């Protein structure tokens, strides 16, 4: 349960604070749940705010099954940003339906500058059957650069790392999707 999770996290957060260690809290399935369906922005915002109030350094908002659309990202951020400042939020997108780049762009428009990403878009979630990997690092970089952001990462180095990882894992190379929406 959500309450049980908070109960288990409390001593970990306190210990990290006592040790001066930054601690990121994660809110999974903030948009859609594989078991319960659509999550209301208010319900997700309640959990995000509660976690922020516990003193975590920042809160990562997860689209764990990759089903969120940009309008749903905007709807959630409209509620959350009345409670928690943008600088304390990170976004965690999966690219199951090819919308992660558009969702990065939607959250960037709200002042979000922290994104969980993975080289090659690998990953997934054992609790969300069928969910694709995390949004590819190169997709985030290209999307934010297209929106005018200065992202000081070497795309060639990312591509080399991606090819090495994919070669090692023996998986298929995934294309890096670009947003279909335009920067605002």
Regions found by a protein language model. Give the residues of each.
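Catalytic cores and adjacent flexible loops of soluble metabolic enzymes
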Residues: 1-184
